[in-house]
Structures are given as structure tokens and as C-alpha cells.
């Protein structure tokens, strides 16, 4: 009898109690590159995951949701994206994981420093860079979009769990795809109204996708609420939402 493949151990965040399974990237990556970079007077740690492709790959850069999270919070995205040909850059927030400093400050500045480090890496197609921001990260991106674009203009922006209404989204001068949960209280404002406002402001195009039966961070709660202390949460990402993101980025990459 063949023994089942052992699963990597979960890492439990001592600050939040959340369990972050180690992503299983061996089959979908040719390299997992550890990257250290400076932000102010501290050194932060990130990781570039390159897909199994002999050519340079389009890059997806992640701007985190709120909380003292590490790169492992987006391990499920690394698995999905590298398996479909995208490189992905994730990093540990200040004061957590392998990053120095004290958690609780400078998140926008740290995201800019991480972006600067990400787009200079070998193995990525600098002309095909996407920014994927989630929740509070969408506000950070909107507030500092000109600074991100000065480093490298993104060919597209995906707003996961977007907090941006019609006024704030106008700051993002790039093609935009909005993905939000159907459980949001202001759903129309952050989806249809936001997309319409962006279309009125810019010629790039804006689309949106509403993830049914999901919670704010786009995990499926059709059957029961998410237990973030149980590593199986990582398997409950909303399939439709993530496929919507991949399809949209592929379309831009091919056109």
C-alpha cells in the first residue's frame, strides 16, 4: 500500500494564533528565492517564487491585508499562480516572520520597499507586472499609487476584498479588476459603482466579480465559518474568485 504524501507542518503565528500551512511549491516552481531588502533602517524579508518556465515570467506582487502576517498567509496564492505561469513576490511584514523591526508602523512604506526589490529581480518580465492588493492593502495602494507607478507602472491591478468606493478608486491609473465578497454591507459601492467611477476617470477598463457565499477575505463559507486555527482553511479559498483573477491577468498578459 502506498503511504499518503506527508503534508508540510503548519506554522502557528504566536501573535494571532492563526495557522499558516507551508505552501507546497516544489512541483510548480523552479526556484524559491529568498530576498532581503531595506525599508528605512530595518531589513525585511521576502520571497520570489518563479514558475517552471525557461522564459521570464509575469510578476504578481502582493500587498497584504491587515494584521501581523507573514508571506505564508499568501502561500495558497503562490501555489495557484506559479502553477499557471506567474511569478509571485510575498514578504513578511515588519516585526513578523524573518523581517526585522517592530510590527505596527510603516506598512505603506514597507510595501513600496518590497515592490522596489521585487521588480528588480532576475527571472521576471518587468514589462508584465501586476499588483494584487487585499483589504487594507487596497487603501494603501490607492493612497500611494503614484509612488508605486514611479518604481514600475503595473500593467494591471487586482483589488481583493476591496475597500475602495467610487472616490478612492480613481487614484489607480491602471486596468483594474475588483473582487469582493457578497457579504459586504456596502457591496454596490465597492463593486459596480467603483468600477463605473474608474471607467469614467480612466480609459484602461475596470471590471468586477462578486464571490458568493464568502467572507471578507474571499474564503468559502457555504458550509460553515472559517476556523483560522485549523490549517485546512487554506483549502477553502473561493474557487470562482481566484479563477476570475487568473483569467483576467492572463487576458492582459496575452493582449
Please state what every model-predicted region is.
Residues 117-172:
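Primarily recognizes the serine-hydrolase "nucleophile elbow" in alpha/beta-hydrolase
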Residues 56-65:
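Short beta-strand element of the alpha/beta-hydrolase
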Residues 102-122:
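Alpha/beta-hydrolase active-site loop
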Residues 12-55:
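N-terminal cap/lid segment of alpha/beta-hydrolase-fold proteins
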Amino acid at each position: 500500500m502506498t503511504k499518503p504524501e506527508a503534508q508540510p507542518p503548519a506554522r502557528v503565528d504566536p501573535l494571532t494564533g492563526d495557522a499558516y500551512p507551508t505552501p507546497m511549491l516544489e512541483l510548480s516552481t523552479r526556484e524559491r528565492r529568498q530576498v532581503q531588502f531595506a525599508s528605512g533602517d530595518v531589513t525585511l524579508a521576502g520571497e520570489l517564487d518563479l514558475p517552471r518556465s525557461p522564459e521570464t515570467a509575469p510578476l504578481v506582487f502582493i500587498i497584504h491585508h491587515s494584521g501581523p502576517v507573514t508571506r505564508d498567509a499568501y502561500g495558497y496564492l503562490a501555489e495557484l499562480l506559479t502553477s499557471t505561469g506567474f511569478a509571485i513576490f510575498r514578504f513578511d511584514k515588519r516585526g513578523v516572520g524573518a523581517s526585522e523591526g517592530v510590527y505596527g508602523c510603516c506598512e505603506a512604506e514597507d510595501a513600496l520597499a518590497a515592490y522596489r526589490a521585487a521588480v528588480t529581480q532576475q527571472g521576471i518580465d518587468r514589462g508584465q507586472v501586476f499588483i494584487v492588493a487585499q483589504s487594507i492593502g487596497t487603501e494603501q495602494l490607492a493612497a500611494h499609487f503614484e509612488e508605486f507607478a514611479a518604481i514600475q507602472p503595473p500593467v494591471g491591478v487586482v483589488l481583493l476584498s476591496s475597500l475602495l468606493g467610487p472616490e478612492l478608486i480613481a487614484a489607480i491609473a491602471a486596468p483594474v479588476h475588483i473582487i469582493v465578497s457578497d457579504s459586504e454591507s456596502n457591496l454596490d459601492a465597492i463593486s459596480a459603482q467603483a468600477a463605473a467611477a474608474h471607467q469614467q476617470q480612466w480609459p484602461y477598463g475596470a471590471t468586477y466579480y462578486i464571490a458568493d457565499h464568502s467572507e471578507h477575505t474571499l474564503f468559502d463559507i457555504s458550509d460553515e465559518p472559517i476556523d483560522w486555527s485549523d490549517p485546512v482553511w487554506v483549502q477553502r479559498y473561493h474557487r470562482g474568485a481566484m479563477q476570475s483573477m487568473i483569467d483576467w491577468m492572463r487576458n492582459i498578459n496575452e493582449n
